[in-house]
């Protein structure tokens, strides 16, 4: 009887110790990075959906400023603005969707539960819903401020081209302590630059400092972050200025290699010289027809990056 009692006591004690250990297990830095990388992103063929990444970057910025919670009422307009600026052109932008659905990724929580089958902007406003990082994520981000930087870089590299990183950081108000390192495939760069004779396919810019080529990039037409391959048919050599304008959707390129400027683009100094003078003209051809951009990649750029309708071409 005594031995049975003692045995039961030991088992109960071990269970309590085990339970306590489980409850005190903390989220590790690697686990957080894995959750971010495995975050569910809405997909339909090759359409872009940067909703969750932009919301997380905005939340990281708020946390950096000492704000742990985001009210939906205050967040919706800013998130919509970010989606319009850095996302593809859409009829509706639906900031309520990521604000609620991010709870399924082990990163986010809401002030109260919301039916994911009936996500409504009006309902979130009426209930004054707020959101923020869940306790274990928040604890790690507060204890290790450097993780905020690392997660921000992870989100940027996974979902946006490098030409947009600084603008996105400025738009969300996040201060990055270190400049993100470039992670380009050197072979892709070399093949593209060779295909376009080491010159910008639009303006012909070609400058060297000694033997080093300066300010010429190998640009993906369909972004690498959106599944675009490192192939010549998905690349074009551009100077850093035209690369940035191309990635921001200021202009696009048609299947017959005609450059078209967006109606939404405008400006004063430099606008005519660096954009409008090339509007409606054919960009330079690569050294071989086999390197010409494929229609599937050009169509993706028009659909997912180009901002609005093209300007009229006056002959």
PLM regions and their residue ranges:
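Short, charged surface segments at domain edges that flank catalytic/cofactor-binding sites
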Residues: 151-208, 221-233, 313-314
